[in-house]
């Protein structure tokens, strides 16, 4: 008789050990957690301990035990009731089924709810089948919508019915994990062929990882709109929060999080070697090497390594250009080196470190061209659904869209209505009521979809006493407003107020800079126990006495506002400020901007920051881009006050094939100096702009509905296919121009194919007139539901799409 399975038998010891270490470091927080664990079953308690053992300190401070209990109970239930889940390797189960965090999202209870919603739809399915079905459910509930940088919880994406790709994938991963399908989010941190990034989902089955587009269901795995785009990536990564790292190439860490290289599943790759030497030509062991791609006109890191005893670092990457920089600190002095490497043609590169203080001299202050090559797309993931599968998928997707549109048509967050209607005590009722709409109005659109009435109520109640002490706009934006940065919106004012006596509160109001001194003494930063992009809330900082530098800055603003002091983080550089004598003053003395850079734009280029130019300062062996705010060129001149030091200006011209013509200008500026530089954008020749793009097969219809392959229509030579939206631009404009050049187009009419939705389109004035003038043009039909997107995305591999998203 087989022995009964033991839950997490292989990892039990290390889970207990790591949990005890966390509890030892945060005893005040873990005392009530331990009490609650004693009331759980042995399996649920162990699952909870795993979550607590490997979660960031921010999660420990931000969320109550009951949130994590939902994840633990659901995971244990799956393990007990689903043989497929019980058969998973423990590391796969722990990291990709049980674990609560996907990326940097808000954490909220969702797993049990999702399982009850989805469970009946996947009865009897294997992981592959279940993953496809779950993704249809996700498409029924949410779709893409461009939003701000704060990442919603999975349940909030479900409720509001949309999110950006990073939020769609957080939602889909949680849905998959809720029913036992191992899943994770993967990222192209920056594309090489266009200014953007993207996130999607991988699922584990049959011992391998497969991918799918979040909320973008297909009838097969390893298929998504981004399939070709991913074959042009220089890096695709996943992340793991556990300290026991799965097999794979580690490409960097973010505090407690380890990043893994997943590119081989998507693109043609090779291993490159970087050798770093010091000024004497000796190997530099322990140098930090950053591998970067040019994106949004700045060099953005996609992987980081440290050199070994031979001064070498190796990376598996795609076949394109990388900007590679290295830095090292010796006796308090930083050394730096950089180069551009085309990995398609080169296997190795060598960097020689020089003191960053000697990085620039007068002779080097000139524009230097750099050609940046994007990888070619390659047929790596070529599986395609059959015609029957596509037809089935289209039908299901249409139904999913209809369901979702009905769900979100008139949806609004009921918590907002509850907050607006709530009455406060009799004395303050009239005053508070007048500020309820103001409080909601000062929140972001995203905040209004997931805020909680009780949270807003505390902020209103404890801020109202200060409303008459300043201008209304100042009070609403910088005292009443619960939002400081991208932190989770929670209560904190009552928690803060009880920490100070009446005398202490008045002293802090009189000199708000003292708030920061108190924070520095009371709150410690443990970056090795955090993820930099996950913020500890003000109340969480107080509970755990820990927080990142950003979390502590947010805490400063929260304390100041709680005490009635108008405060904010500066929108340009996130520096702490409070209002004094009607203007914001910095809490920490800023480095003096003691010199001036005058940039000349010229007359032919429209310069847009982080689109075709940027400027970065060299500090601690690393260039950091300046976050310019509302600065604009006036009469082709931009005056930038700067701190003295070494800088690099980048300009970039993205070509249709994804390559870039870059220009770099390195310079040093001294205290008191005024320096003039004219921005230069490299121009492209016509031959640089042209590109042959291989298009996927697609079907069109004749007038009688017969389907015809596009390849058959173009078998006898080159053709122009024009998908026309009658009586809309740019169709109308193009048709009129064709008629103006009737003679030039007449000789090519037989090679021109107009694609329209219906016969009625042919009767519209401009189109019917064009057909009368340009005889022999062929007419075919399509409903524009799929082909347009497919072809458009294929072409977008070679152009810059819409604003950044993640």
Predicted regions and their residues:
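Short, ordered, surface-exposed loop/turn motifs in non-cytosolic proteins
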Residues: 279-298, 320, 511, 603-627, ...
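Hydrophobic/aromatic-rich core segments of domains that either
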Residues: 116, 120-136, 145-156, 160-253, ...
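Short, internal strand/loop/helix patches
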Residues: 766-796
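Short, acidic Ser/Thr/Gly-rich low-complexity loop/linker segments typical of extracellular
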Residues: 295-316, 620-637
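Conserved small/polar residues in nucleotide/adenosyl-binding loops
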Residues: 798-805
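A short, amphipathic beta-strand motif
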Residues: 270-278, 595-605, 799
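Secondary-structure boundary elements
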Residues: 3-160, 390, 395-544, 554
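Short active-site neighborhood of thiol/selenol oxidoreductases, capturing the structured segment around
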Residues: 713-731
């Amino acid at each position: 008789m087989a022995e009964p399975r033991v839950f997490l038998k292989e990892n039990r010891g290390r889970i207990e050990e790591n949990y005890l270490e966390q509890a030892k470091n945060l005893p005040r927080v873990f005392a009530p957690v331990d009490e609650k664990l004693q009331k759980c079953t042995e399996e649920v308690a162990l699952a909870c301990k795993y979550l607590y053992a490997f979660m960031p300190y921010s999660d420990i401070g931000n969320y109550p035990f009951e949130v994590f209990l939902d994840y633990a109970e659901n995971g244990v239930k799956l393990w007990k009731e689903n043989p497929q889940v019980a058969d998973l390797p423990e590391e796969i189960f722990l990291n990709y089924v049980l674990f609560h965090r996907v990326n940097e999202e808000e954490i909220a209870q969702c797993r049990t709810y999702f399982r009850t919603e989805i469970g009946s739809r996947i009865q009897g399915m294997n992981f592959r089948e279940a993953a496809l079905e779950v993704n249809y459910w996700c498409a029924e509930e949410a779709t893409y919508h461009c939003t701000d940088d704060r990442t919603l919880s999975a349940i909030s994406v479900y409720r509001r019915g949309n999110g950006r790709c990073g939020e769609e994938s957080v939602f889909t991963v949680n849905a998959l994990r809720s029913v036992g399908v191992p899943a994770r989010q993967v990222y192209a941190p920056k594309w090489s062929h266009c200014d953007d990034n993207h996130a999607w989902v991988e699922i584990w089955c049959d011992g391998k990882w497969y991918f799918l587009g979040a909320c973008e269901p297909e009838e097969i795995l390893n298929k998504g709109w981004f399939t070709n785009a991913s074959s042009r990536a220089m890096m695709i990564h996943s992340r793991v929060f556990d300290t026991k790292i799965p097999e794979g190439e580690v490409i960097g860490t973010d505090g407690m999080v380890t990043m893994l290289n997943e590119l081989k599943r998507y693109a043609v790759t090779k291993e490159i070697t970087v050798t770093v030497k010091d000024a004497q030509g000796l190997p530099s062991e322990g140098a930090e090497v950053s591998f970067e791609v040019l994106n949004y006109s700045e060099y953005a890191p996609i992987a980081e390594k440290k050199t070994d005893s031979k001064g070498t670092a190796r990376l598996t990457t795609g076949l394109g250009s990388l900007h590679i920089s290295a830095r090292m600190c010796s006796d308090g002095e930083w050394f730096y080196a950089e180069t551009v490497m085309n990995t398609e043609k080169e296997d190795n590169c060598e960097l020689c470190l020089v003191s960053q203080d000697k990085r620039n001299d007068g002779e080097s202050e000139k524009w230097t061209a750099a050609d940046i090559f994007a990888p070619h797309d390659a047929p790596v993931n070529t599986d395609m659904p059959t015609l029957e599968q596509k037809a089935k998928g289209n039908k299901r997707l249409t139904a999913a869209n209809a369901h979702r549109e009905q769900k979100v048509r008139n949806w609004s967050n009921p918590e907002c209505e509850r907050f607006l209607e709530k009455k406060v005590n009799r004395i303050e009722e009239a005053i508070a009521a007048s500020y309820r709409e103001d409080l909601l109005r000062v929140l972001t659109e995203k905040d209004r979809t997931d805020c909680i009435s009780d949270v807003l109520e505390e902020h209103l109640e404890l801020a109202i006493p200060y409303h008459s002490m300043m201008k209304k706009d100042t009070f609403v934006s910088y005292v009443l407003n619960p939002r400081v940065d991208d932190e989770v919106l929670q209560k904190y004012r009552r928690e803060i107020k009880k920490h100070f006596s009446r005398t202490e509160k008045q002293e802090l109001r009189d000199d708000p800079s003292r708030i920061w001194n108190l924070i520095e003494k009371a709150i410690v930063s443990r970056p090795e126990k955090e993820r930099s992009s996950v913020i500890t809330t003000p109340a969480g900082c107080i509970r755990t006495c820990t927080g990142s530098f950003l979390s502590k800055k947010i805490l400063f603003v929260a304390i100041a506002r709680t005490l009635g002091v108008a405060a904010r983080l500066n929108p340009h550089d996130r520096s702490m400020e409070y209002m004094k004598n009607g203007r914001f003053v910095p809490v920490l003395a800023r480095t003096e901007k003691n010199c001036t850079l005058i940039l000349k734009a010229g007359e032919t280029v429209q310069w847009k920051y982080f689109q075709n130019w940027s400027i970065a300062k060299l500090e601690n062996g690393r260039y950091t881009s300046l976050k310019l705010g509302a600065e604009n060129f006036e009469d082709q001149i931009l005056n930038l006050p700067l701190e003295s030091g070494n800088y690099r200006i980048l300009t970039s011209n993205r070509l249709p094939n994804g390559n870039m013509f870059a220009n770099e200008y390195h310079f040093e500026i001294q205290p008191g100096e005024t320096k003039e530089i004219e921005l230069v954008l490299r121009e492209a020749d016509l031959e640089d702009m042209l590109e042959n793009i291989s298009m996927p097969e697609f079907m069109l219809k004749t007038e009688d509905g017969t389907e015809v392959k596009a390849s058959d229509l173009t078998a006898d030579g080159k053709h122009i296919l024009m998908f026309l939206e009658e009586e809309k631009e740019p169709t109308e404009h193009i048709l009129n121009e064709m008629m103006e050049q009737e003679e030039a187009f007449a000789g090519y009419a037989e090679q021109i194919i107009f694609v329209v939705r219906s016969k009625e389109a042919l009767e519209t004035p401009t189109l019917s007139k064009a057909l009368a003038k340009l005889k022999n043009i062929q007419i075919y039909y399509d409903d524009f539901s799929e082909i347009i997107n497919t072809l458009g995305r294929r072409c977008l591999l070679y152009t810059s799409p819409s604003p950044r998203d993640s």
